[in-house]
Amino acid sequence: MKLHEMKPVEGARKERNRVGRGMASGNGKTSGRGHKGQKARSGGGVRLGFEGGQLPLFRRLPKRGFTNINRKDYAIVNLDQLNRFEDGTEITPASLIETGVVSNEKSGIKVLGNGELSKKLTVKAHKFSASAKEAIEGKGGTTEVI
């Protein structure tokens, strides 16, 4: 078999159904839209969430919660991500961005205790979880809140 002899499997390529092209096509006249009514018209159809005049679900349910405008969104760094640095390195938010551990600082850097730390490091960040602080100081490193 050669490349120019290859054909798609029977039934793999279905022909497009052209509607409104005469009664003999099987899809003439109303073009599969039925007779009259809103759905038969161009642009016909109900808007998203419309339930036929019944009070829609999104209006039946009460409003809930709010968006805190003072919310702080921290960039997360896990302990196992700190292993890429050399032993005894001072890690700052700038060095984390430079090495690609985090893409941007957001409201600050928070170090979490997921994974294992195998090096003695000095870590400067905006927040530390208790387990992260314990692990860093357990390896002889230091943590500094900035």
From Swiss-Prot:
Chain spans, region Disordered: 1-48
A Gene Ontology cellular-component term: cytosolic large ribosomal subunit
Keywords associated with the record: Ribonucleoprotein, Ribosomal protein, RNA-binding, rRNA-binding
Regions annotated as coiled coil: none
Biased composition (Basic and acidic residues): 1-18
PROSITE patterns with a match to the protein in the record: RIBOSOMAL_L15
Record's function text: Binds to the 23S rRNA.
HAMAP family tied to this protein: Ribosomal_uL15
Quaternary organization: Part of the 50S ribosomal subunit.
Family: Belongs to the universal ribosomal protein uL15 family.
Name by which UniProt lists this protein: Large ribosomal subunit protein uL15
Native organism taxonomy: Bacteria, Bacillati, Bacillota, Bacilli, Bacillales
